[in-house]
Amino acid sequence: MKVILLGTFNILEAIRNNNLNIRIIHVSTDEVYSDILNGSYKEDDRLKPSSPYAASKASADMFCLAYHRTYGLNVIITRCSNNFGPYQFPEKFIPKIIIRANMGLKVPIYGSGKNIRDWIYVLDHCEALDLILKNGKSGEIYNISSNNEFENIKIAEMILDIMNKPKDLIEFVEDRPGHDIRYSLDSSKIRKELNWKPKYSFKESLEKTIEWYLNNEWWWKPLATEKILHPTPWKLKWDTLSLLS
């Protein structure tokens, strides 16, 4: 949270105080909107962050918009759905399932497993960011999504099927505190105004991602500590300073 809030503020101040003529792309998150049972959030919908992380990201968004309006900084905000792909940190949902299943460990699913996330392959997200950097309008917000909505349990089952692992590896565990039910973004703005659309199918991207983790143990193994791979990491004791960084 410290990096998100003070880091964003420091960057904005540095640009303002040095009269730098540069464009800032502030990469936010769909979590600033909170969950939604029906429909999808648009860029001008009210923010209702439900976690400390989401609240800090929403605050950073407000800083960016304020500096654009007050000081004329060339700032654009993007809000993207859940990313997946190579080099994602092992604590994240998809990498954790792949790694634990590959090790023959139980695959933890929070609560009922019915929570829904909209997934986007990392390369689609990167191409959207590049397009916004080049052609986006200053002071605007752009939602980025691929409309690949799946329940968490379905994602786990798909991964196990691709890996030829048994479904009995799935283990339902205590739900995460403040676990939002469903995220969904309306990305019609970037599609219409900047002619962006996702290129990669979900199934192909998931297969590529699994293959990457299986072939690149050298990268993730030093990161995949017992704490990182823990089924319910929020119950563990963490260094308070690191959590605030």
Give each language-model segment a name.
Residues 9, 36, 56, 87, ...:
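Gly/Ser/Thr-rich beta-alpha loop segments that engage phosphate groups in nucleotides
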